[in-house]
Amino acid sequence: MERITVTLGERSYPITIAAGLFNEPASFLPLKSGDQVMLVTNETLAPLYLDKVRGVLERAGVNVDSVILPDGEQYKSLTVLDTVFTALLKKPHGRDTTLVALGGGVIGDLTGFAAASYQRGVRFIQVPTTLLSQVDSSVGGKTAVNHPLGKNMIGAFYQPASVVVDLDCLKTLPARELASGLAEVIKYGIILDADFFTWLEGNLDALLRLDGPAMAYCIRRCCELKAEVVAADEREAGLRALLNLGHTFGHAIEAEMGYGNWLHGEAVAAGIVMAARASERLGQFSSADTQRIIALLERAGLPVNGPCEMSAQDYLPHMLRDKKVLAGELRLVLPLTIGKSEVRGGVSHEVVLSAIADCQQA
């Protein structure tokens, strides 16, 4: 069992990583006998894990209710959020309740925002079941729902009480979802850790076949990097913005194409290549490094071009609603070398449009 701490003073919390955690009541820190829980999951995961997690919590003396939501990015909405509030109020659950998010990024983000909002804040625990949520979205306290005009536009910074990463969940993950998570994994190497990127080049095949030791190391390293960044910059005033490499372009794809048509990691993968192309055009990133990124993304089964249905101009309205925009000026996360990146303002629309055009599908 691996345990990593996200260090935030009194709000510090553990990330527990191992196989078989759903069999151990002690995994679900800080729950104890007599606590009340609302377990939030979706229609796809409920048949796989709901009874197992409910059973282990009930054996520990925890009182468990549950709400099952529809599955998909398109349901990360205010309407579905209200379903969680209604379930909490009907029981009823008070301020001493704990929400448990059993699912991927959609369930984690939505449940976290419900916890931040319900009765002005209740405790919640992240139990991520996808690679993407295990390495990224479950750690750091970003919670949100989408708006038709933009992704994650309605939300809050609200840290979980703990994160429980059961590696066995990856055995039921569809191949497309595994690839989507690998986009965020590869991102960490590009922005923060050149050695990790090189390790990924040598071990990607092992990850694709769900090799246990390789996957455990991969998830641990990503969580270590994320925990370090969050501890240094919880509310994204500077360093944490680097974690958004590819996301300004990627969120534009998700919003324009309709939430759920492109998986988040797929859109981010294409966005990473667009960011690399923009950095190339600014003379600060080598074409050789861009090709290394493209090669690794393609080996993971990820797109390296944007959707053919979108023109370069279609991206800009969405990008200008990005949360990093200041005083109407676009700010992009751009790679400088493999393992180092920056947030750069003042990038001309011409450079942005040219970078997107470089990545248009035929």
UniProtKB/Swiss-Prot annotation:
Q: Name one Pfam family in it.
A: DHQS_C
Any single GO CC term annotated in Swiss-Prot or TrEMBL for this entry: cytoplasm
Q: Which note does the record give on the cofactor?
A: Binds 1 divalent metal cation per subunit. Can use either Co(2+) or Zn(2+).
Q: What is this protein called?
A: 3-dehydroquinate synthase
Enzyme Commission no: 4.2.3.4
Query: Which terms are listed as keywords in the entry?
Result: Amino-acid biosynthesis, Aromatic amino acid biosynthesis, Cobalt, Cytoplasm, Lyase, Metal-binding, NAD, Nucleotide-binding, Zinc
Role this protein plays? Catalyzes the conversion of 3-deoxy-D-arabino-heptulosonate 7-phosphate (DAHP) to dehydroquinate (DHQ).
Keyword presence, Membrane: no
Which pathway?
Metabolic intermediate biosynthesis; chorismate biosynthesis; chorismate from D-erythrose 4-phosphate and phosphoenolpyruvate: step 2/7
Please state the protein's primary subcellular location.
Answer: cytoplasm
Q: Which GO terms describe its molecular function?
A: 3-dehydroquinate synthase activity; metal ion binding; nucleotide binding
Top-rank EC class of the record's enzyme: lyase
Q: Where is this protein found? A: Cytoplasm
Q: Which reactions fall under this protein's catalytic activity?
A: 7-phospho-2-dehydro-3-deoxy-D-arabino-heptonate = 3-dehydroquinate + phosphate
Q: Which residues bind NAD(+)?
A: 71-76, 105-109, 129-130, 142, 151, 169-172
Q: Which GO terms describe its biological process?
A: amino acid biosynthetic process; aromatic amino acid family biosynthetic process; chorismate biosynthetic process
UniProt lists the family membership as follows: Belongs to the sugar phosphate cyclases superfamily. Dehydroquinate synthase family.
SUPFAM superfamilies xref list: Dehydroquinate synthase-like (SSF56796)
Co-factor requirement: NAD(+); Co(2+); Zn(2+)
Annotated binding of Zn(2+), by residue: 184, 247, 264
